């Protein structure tokens, strides 16, 4: 069964209390999680100043420094496929796109909604394209599709050749559109990248030049924000509960990615105001047999089989919490897209039990209230009964508190989790990469200006997930949930290896493994991926662990 949160005796220590001794000189960890950028979307043309080896579009010959197609551009070609009977994670290929369709606007700020984006050519070469050849670096772009079953299809067994086709045939889900004829307004959004060699993302480049960059870090769950933030908090996933036991969600909230009759890959039930649960232990459930078959064919054992509890309906996309940010219960029901309160153990409870201080600082909080800058699915601890039903909810604080705590390091917790306000998160359509850089520059600058704090701190800079952007990196499938696409991670610290690119395979649960190693904690639950071993290097491929499944603990980013 899913492990319920156990009674914890010393759960409520003050957020600024002295932490027990650490195993490294790092006494403060600040984890900053923006949104929705793949590694190649950001670092496509980055060349390490140190001369380190790096896997990106430039090093692979996919593009040139000027962003134009490189000698091996054709190996990224996007293909056309067919799924007319039941969902497949490796659909039957019909052919190859000649040219890619014009990207759509989706809901980008300041642009007409859900139309072709006239700033881009009507047709694009079949492969990655430089966004800033067509628009300014600070301009918003449309939002690529990034959902669970869609990403499994897009990855296509590691070939990564169905990103555009899935975006065009299923999009964000059938409940978000009336019928296939209404279109998805995605086009080739997923294939866009920024060009560091031409001056894009200057602050990310500065951080990578001076600190430690991972080029093998991944989102832990296929798909979008909500499930990936839950993996950061729990090392696993959350499921539907009723009256203290696993239950069955309303029928209209269960995902069904099987195609509707007479359509090609138009999901039967899918969408943000619709299907988001999957009973992933049961191969008779829609979409699950294909994932189980893929796991069974892996050349190594997956973690805990599917790592799905029998009878559990897991939340694999975005729903809001069964609690309001104040701690009050929220209304639930078939047309209220919230998951009931959760008993899944979190890193916050484990830290409190150990007597280690922590806080979560979500952008858009305003005391106990919230503003339009608040992202409810980016705030995973408000889903937890153990947090929201007691004094630990007081550790969820706004960003005025964050900057006050940085200035007065006596109040700075040992472990801090930070999510930017929506407009500074980097999320396509609602923010920009440049706005996320501004937030990071301000935050890291504040930490560095407090010398006593900076000398014993590490700041991990990452994003929740890839946002549906294409990426050339290898993906290690661990269980039915993922991993998913490669994403950026930079360790900013006096102890970081300077200008080094680390190839150790990691995902967001590696952040938990680092915390557990540094503050002497045990794995969170029977199914949490923090049980996985540290990778053993394969001499023939630095990016693929020889002892799969395995994920690192981020210690290789530092020198102590």
Predicted regions and their residues:
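N-terminal pro-sequences and low-complexity stem/linker regions of secreted or lumenal proteins
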Residues: 16-560
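N-terminal signal peptide c-region/cleavage motif recognized by signal peptidases
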Residues: 12-14
């Amino acid at each position: 069964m899913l492990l319920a949160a156990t009674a914890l005796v010393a759960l409520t220590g003050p957020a600024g209390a002295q932490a027990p001794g650490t195993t490294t000189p790092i006494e403060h960890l600040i984890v900053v999680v923006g949104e929705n950028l793949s590694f190649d979307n950001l670092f496509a043309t980055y060349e390490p100043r140190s001369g380190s080896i790096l896997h990106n579009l430039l090093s692979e010959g996919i593009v040139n420094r000027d962003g134009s197609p490189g000698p091996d551009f054709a190996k990224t070609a996007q293909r056309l496929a067919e799924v007319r009977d039941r969902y497949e994670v490796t659909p039957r290929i019909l052919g190859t796109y000649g040219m890619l369709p014009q990207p759509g606007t989706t809901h980008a700020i300041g642009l007409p909604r859900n139309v072709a984006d006239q700033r881009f050519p009507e047709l694009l070469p079949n492969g990655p394209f430089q966004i800033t050849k067509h628009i300014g670096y600070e301009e918003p772009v449309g939002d690529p599709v990034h959902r669970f079953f869609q990403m499994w299809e897009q990855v296509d067994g590691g070939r990564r050749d169905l990103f555009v086709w899935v975006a065009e045939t299923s999009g964000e889900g059938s409940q978000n559109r009336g019928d296939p004829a209404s279109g998805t307004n995605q086009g080739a959004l997923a294939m866009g990248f920024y060009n560091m060699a031409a001056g894009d993302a200057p602050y990310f480049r500065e951080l990578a030049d001076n600190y430690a960059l991972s080029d093998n870090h991944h989102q832990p769950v296929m798909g979008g924000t909500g499930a990936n933030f839950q993996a950061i908090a729990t090392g696993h996933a959350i499921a539907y509960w009723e009256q203290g036991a696993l239950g069955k969600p309303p029928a209209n909230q269960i995902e069904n990615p099987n195609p509707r009759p007479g359509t090609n890959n138009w999901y039967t039930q899918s969408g943000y105001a619709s299907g988001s649960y999957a009973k992933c232990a049961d191969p008779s459930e829609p979409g699950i047999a294909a994932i189980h078959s893929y796991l069974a064919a892996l050349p190594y054992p997956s973690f805990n089989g599917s790592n799905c509890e029998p009878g559990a309906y897991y939340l694999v996309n975005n729903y809001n919490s069964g609690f309001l940010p104040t701690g009050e219960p929220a209304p639930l029901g078939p047309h209220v897209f919230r998951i009931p309160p959760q008993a899944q153990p979190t890193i916050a409870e484990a830290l409190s039990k150990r007597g280690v201080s922590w806080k979560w600082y979500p952008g858009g909080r305003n005391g106990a209230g919230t503003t339009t800058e608040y992202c409810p699915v980016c705030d995973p601890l408000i889903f937890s009964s153990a947090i929201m039903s007691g004094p630990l909810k007081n550790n969820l604080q706004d960003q005025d508190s964050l900057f006050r705590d940085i200035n007065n390091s006596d109040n700075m917790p040992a472990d801090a989790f930070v999510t930017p306000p929506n407009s500074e998160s980097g999320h396509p359509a609602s923010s920009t990469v440049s706005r996320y850089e501004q937030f990071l520059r301000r935050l890291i600058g504040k930490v560095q200006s407090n010398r006593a704090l900076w000398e014993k701190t590490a700041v991990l800079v990452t994003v929740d997930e890839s946002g549906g952007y294409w990426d050339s990196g290898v993906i290690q499938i661990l269980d039915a949930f993922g991993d998913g696409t490669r994403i950026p991670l930079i360790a900013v610290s006096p102890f970081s290896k300077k200008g080094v690119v680390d190839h150790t395979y990691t995902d967001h649960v590696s952040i938990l493994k680092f915390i557990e190693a540094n503050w002497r904690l045990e794995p969170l639950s029977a199914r949490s991926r923090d049980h996985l071993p540290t990778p053993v290097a394969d001499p023939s491929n630095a990016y693929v662990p020889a002892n799969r499944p395995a994920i690192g603990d981020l210690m290789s980013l530092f020198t102590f």
